[in-house]
Curated annotation (Swiss-Prot):
Keyword Hydrolase found: no
Domain of life: Bacteria
Name of the protein described by the UniProt record: Valine--tRNA ligase
List of residues binding ATP: K539
Assembly description: Monomer.
The EC number(s) this enzyme carries: 6.1.1.9
Family statement: Belongs to the class-I aminoacyl-tRNA synthetase family. ValS type 2 subfamily.
PROSITE patterns: AA_TRNA_LIGASE_I (PS00178)
The record's note on its domains: ValRS has two distinct active sites: one for aminoacylation and one for editing. The misactivated threonine is translocated from the active site to the editing site.
Statement: the UniProt record of this protein carries the keyword Zinc: no
GO BP field: valyl-tRNA aminoacylation
């Protein structure tokens, strides 16, 4: 008989098993397995944009719980890992890390530096993901900037061009003056900012004063009209007249529109090109002229005696207000707090500029997308409303152009040939991936074309993350159509709730447009990991937790235990107490396994190899049968919870069974029989050891998705040299049940609880002998009575049926 190791060293064992799993390819995907046997995950490719934090561990391990369960259930798992390593987030990381600015450098040199940085950063992710035991198949790894990903992303673009779902136009777009790029609606956030409502004097062309309230007086040079509500009786006399702008003396029409709020300001609103989306609506609806005064750098471009040319927006606002005051054209100012649209990443207030951009048709598909949201299986269900709210709020088509550098280029040129100047030239699919700055369209020379200098929004590539793994976009555009057809649509998209409006939405949109389908059957939405005081983690607060330190202190299994204690979709605070509970659980598992291990040499070899169903008749003791029935019930419940993506419920059920049913009760109650030092009851001894053997084996499998290292170590010591994590290793006891009256075993537990409380109240050892237990309300069988005697140290037990309520009298 082999020896049980004295101690469990999580540092050594976790490294050992991670290496063995890789070497033995325990998590390898089998491309030859049937489609119906395969379970496919659209793993979130982490953005290569900065420091790793505990939030990465939190969300990725929750996905891994489900993946490991599905593998153990017999599924052929396709579990890739990608890296979202292109676009603005990565550029900002590189600029910060290297103290450089992309616009001050040669484009190719900046891209080269980006490539070097992401390679280094991605290695950190790989190391962390291996340490936390993500059961990914690393041979399926992809990068969103790799040649293959660029090819598939450009295929997506060409497919949507072919389907007339993409267009290019010169229209107002949201512009980030700090990062110098157009943004999509999903890239912005509303921020509360303090400002002034400025009441300014305009005049009619007849010289009558008009008071207009505005927060943006610097846009006066771009004023193209003044509006009032058609039902506003105060201004009906202005119909058909014009207004004269202060300082700039431009004549603009006075018009009516129902979008004007009569209760805001004075009810007179100036329309400028452009201050907000309402300005755009009025500009289009009323066919107004375009006056552009704001540059891409967020400065004023307007030659005038006010000398605001070249000033930044805030500087120009201050100067205009000062001049208005000097000329007594500023009537008053009111302090206000209002919502300002800002760039999500740079934090800069956005401007609206008119720049040629590529757009994906979105608004026209809103109703179809709402139906898609309803077809999808949401886990948890309430997260669906977030997508529905976002779809209903969409008011812009998706702008996918970015005026940046490190991204997927548009496979596009513009002709300079005589007679076709400006004609859009698209790359042939056989040319992909292409860089229009280096490559040429078929049949054209360098002198005959102008490349598209923009790159795609990083979401334009991330939104085809399923297809980056399946290697296809549609029937017409695929690198490997057989692979794509086998893997798409996928089974699961795991992701965080804050990117439902971006990653989930865009991926659903793309799959709908490309193949008229959903990209996956299920979406599993995780919450945020918060600091211990339930505040959001941030570097400025100094409360960001670094995974490496926690791994060093507690090990991977304990951190995964903490993650498993959080309900799916819930925001959860980091908790030292939960970590300590996880550490206790690992230690208790080790000690419980050590206890049962010493008895296993008493079992016959064939009984160790047989299933619990096959040796059912050899478990003869009544309490053992009750224990097995409880185990079968646990397996059914935990399996059902995991099938419904409720990993936290499965973990809670399993842990509670382990601590209460097994450790607190069964081990203590069956201990005397398991040892049977006087050889009084060999059949009862064999029954208890066989029960322990299978209960422990089953619990290790139920814990395995959550704590893979300790369960693997114990499984190999106690049971098999094969991995506990291999395909098909889950337990199925659907046909197993002992026909017994559970009231007997449950009555034993109730009596035991009364005795334990009695001894605890009197500060007596649990082993303190009892002369007589007088029990009323139940009569136990001889087997249960013997077990009760052993566990309570009672010399004699007398039963009497007075009523159904159990009462115990203890005589020491």
């Amino acid at each position: 008989m082999k020896e049980f190791p004295k101690n469990y060293n999580f540092t050594e064992n976790e490294k050992k098993w991670q290496q063995i799993w890789q070497e033995k390819q325990i998590y390898a995907y089998n491309p030859n397995a049937a489609k119906e046997e395969t379970y496919v995950i659209d793993t979130p490719p982490p953005t290569v944009s900065g420091q790793l934090h505990i939030g990465h561990v939190y969300s990725y391990t929750q996905t891994d719980f489900i993946v490991r369960f599905q593998r153990m259930m017999g599924k052929n798992i396709f579990y890739p890992m990608g890296f979202d390593d292109n676009g603005l987030p990565t550029e900002r990381l590189v600029e910060k890390q290297k103290q450089i600015k992309a616009y001050n450098m040669d484009r190719s040199e900046f891209i080269k530096i980006c490539e070097e940085v992401v390679e280094s950063e991605e290695e950190k992710f790989r190391s962390l993901f291996n340490q936390i035991a993500l059961s990914v198949d690393w041979s399926l790894e992809y990068q969103t900037i790799s040649p293959l990903s660029r090819k598939i992303s450009q295929m997506s673009f060409l497919d949507l061009v072919q389907k007339e779902e993409i267009y290019r136009t010169n229209q107002p777009i949201l512009w980030d003056p700090v990062d110098g790029t157009a943004l999509a609606q999903a890239d912005i956030e509303d921020k509360e900012k303090t400002s002034f409502m400025n009441y300014i004097t305009f005049k009619t062309e007849q010289g009558d004063p008009l008071t207009i309230a505005t927060t943006r007086p610097e846009l006066l040079p771009a004023c193209v009209a003044v509006f009032y509500h058609p039902d506003d009786g105060r201004y009906k006399h202005l119909a058909g007249k014009s207004a004269i702008t202060p300082l700039f003396n431009e004549q603009v029409p006075l018009l009516t529109d129902p979008l004007v709020r009569q209760d805001k300001g004075t009810g007179l609103v100036m329309c400028c090109t452009f201050g907000d989306q309402t300005d755009i609506t009025w500009w289009k609806t009323h066919n107004l002229p375009l006056k552009t005064i704001i540059t891409k750098k967020g400065t004023i471009d307007f030659q005038h005696e006010t000398s605001i040319d070249g000033l930044k927006i805030k500087e120009a606002r201050t100067k205009i207000i000062d001049i208005l005051k000097e000329q007594e054209l500023l009537i008053k100012q009111e302090d206000i707090t209002h919502t300002v649209k800002c760039a999500e990443r740079s934090g800069a207030p956005l401007e609206i500029l008119t720049v040629p951009q590529w757009f994906v048709k979105t608004i026209s598909h809103k109703e179809e997308l709402l139906k898609r949201a309803n077809e999808l299986n949401w886990h948890p269900k309430h997260m669906k409303i977030r997508l529905e709210n976002w779809i209903n709020a969409i008011s812009w088509d998706w702008c996918i152009s970015r005026q940046r550098y490190f991204g997927v280029p548009f496979p596009v040129w513009y002709s300079k040939r005589v007679g076709e100047e400006g004609k859009i030239l698209y790359a042939d699919v056989t040319q992909l991936p292409i860089d229009p700055l280096k490559d040429l369209p078929m049949g054209y020379s360098k002198e005959e074309v102008e490349p598209d200098y923009d790159v795609m929004d990083t979401w334009a590539t991330s939104s085809v993350s399923p297809q980056l793994s399946t290697h296809g976009i549609s029937d017409d555009f695929a690198v490997n159509k057989d692979r794509h057809d086998k893997l798409f649509p996928m089974d699961l998209r795991p992701q965080a709730h804050e990117i439902i409006r971006t990653w989930a939405f865009y991926t659903i949109l793309k799959a709908h447009l490309h193949q008229n389908t959903l990209p996956w059957k299920n979406i599993m939405v995780s919450g945020w990991c918060l600091a211990e005081d339930r505040s959001k983690m941030s570097k400025s607060k100094g409360n960001v937790l670094v995974p490496e330190k926690l791994l060093e202190q507690y090990g991977s299994d304990v951190i995964r235990y903490w993650s498993a204690n959080s309900k799916l979709g819930a925001d959860t605070a980091y908790s030292e107490d939960v970590m300590k509970n996880g550490k206790r659980l690992v230690n208790k598992l080790w000690n419980a396994a050590k206890f049962v291990f010493i008895h296993f040499d008493k079992l016959k070899g064939e009984d160790k190899k047989a299933s619990l169903l096959d040796i059912k008749e050899k478990i003869t003791n009544e309490f053992d049968k009750w224990m097995v029935n409880k185990l079968v019930e646990l397996v059914k419940l935990a399996t059902n919870e995991l099938q419904n993506y409720e990993y936290a419920n499965a973990m809670h059920l399993t842990e509670k069974f382990f601590w209460v049913v097994l450790c607190d009760n069964y081990l203590e109650i069956s201990k005397t029989r398991s040892y049977d030092e006087e050889h009084k009851n060999p059949q009862g001894q064999y029954s208890s050891i066989l029960t322990l053997y299978h209960v422990m084996q089953t619990l290790l499998k139920l814990f395995a998705p959550f704590m893979p290292h300790i369960t693997e170590e114990l499984y190999q010591i106690l049971y098999s040299e094969n991995s506990i994590h291999v395909k098909g290793s889950w337990v199925n006891y659907s046909d197993l049940n002992y026909e017994i009256n559970a009231k007997g075993a449950e009555g034993l537990l109730e009596i035991l609880d009364i005795v334990r409380k009695f001894k605890a109240e009197k500060n007596l050892s649990i082993k303190t002998p009892i002369k007589l237990l007088e029990v009323s309300g139940i009569v136990l069988s001889a087997e249960l009575t013997e077990d009760l005697k052993n566990v309570t140290s009672a010399e004699e037990i007398q039963f009497e049926m007075k009523d159904d309520k159990i009462k115990v009298n203890i005589i020491l």
